[in-house]
Amino acid sequence: MAARVCCQLDPARDVLCLRPVGAESRGRPVSGPFGPLPSPSSSAVPADHGARLSLRGLPVCAFSSAGPCALRFTSARRMETTVNAHQVLPKVLHKRTLGLSAMSTTDLEAYFKDCLFKDWEELGEEIRLMVFVLGGCRHKLVCSPAPCNFFTSA
């Protein structure tokens, strides 16, 4: 079963946040502890980083009770298709990261809610789950062997 998260716009930071639904994480467990987490320079991430969470490759802010700065959850199959007839999701998000105009936050929010989450819950695509930084987040990744890449496949 895929982790259940809700999609919320944080107007103060102008980012799209994915927050866990309920009090505990439902992600797949991985063997071994995460170990000590790097201390971010920003005070926006409290000490309750929640190292017990089980998804690999998340930035430190993902473990904050305030939620991650901005994350994109997708599947390998979705990476190969289009958001709509005109835009490919990785390119759209990469443009957004560079500060170029692309898809609006409202459109992204609708895409997450209507496409990705529905597929995970109905089709059980948890095994192909990938995690990417959406952009604007300066927090370091945890347990990630290589820098985040928008075009990485599962």
From Swiss-Prot:
Biological processes annotated in GO: DNA-templated transcription; symbiont-mediated activation of host NF-kappaB cascade; symbiont-mediated arrest of host cell cycle during G2/M transition; viral genome replication
Main subcellular localisation: host cell
Keywords, sorted A to Z: Activation of host NF-kappa-B by virus, Activator, Apoptosis, Host cytoplasm, Host G2/M cell cycle arrest by virus, Host mitochondrion, Host nucleus, Host-virus interaction, Modulation of host cell cycle by virus, Transcription, Transcription regulation
Protein name stated in the entry: Protein X
Annotated segments matching region Mitochondrial targeting sequence: 68-117
GO CC annotation: host cell mitochondrion; host cell nucleus
Subunit structure and binding partners: May form homodimer. May interact with host CEBPA, CFLAR, CREB1, DDB1, E4F1, HBXIP, HSPD1/HSP60, NFKBIA, POLR2E and SMAD4. Interacts with host SMC5-SMC6 complex and induces its degradation. Interacts with host TRPC4AP; leading to prevent ubiquitination of TRPC4AP. Interacts with host PLSCR1; this interaction promotes ubiquitination and degradation of HBx and impairs HBx-mediated cell proliferation.
Encoding gene, per UniProt annotation: X
Function of the protein: Multifunctional protein that plays a role in silencing host antiviral defenses and promoting viral transcription. Does not seem to be essential for HBV infection. May be directly involved in development of cirrhosis and liver cancer (hepatocellular carcinoma). Most of cytosolic activities involve modulation of cytosolic calcium. The effect on apoptosis is controversial depending on the cell types in which the studies have been conducted. May induce apoptosis by localizing in mitochondria and causing loss of mitochondrial membrane potential.
Coiled coil stretches, renumbered: none
Record PTM: A fraction may be phosphorylated in insect cells and HepG2 cells, a human hepatoblastoma cell line. Phosphorylated in vitro by host protein kinase C or mitogen-activated protein kinase. N-acetylated in insect cells.
Assigned protein family: Belongs to the orthohepadnavirus protein X family.
Subcellular location: Host cytoplasm; Host nucleus; Host mitochondrion
Pfam family of the protein (one): X
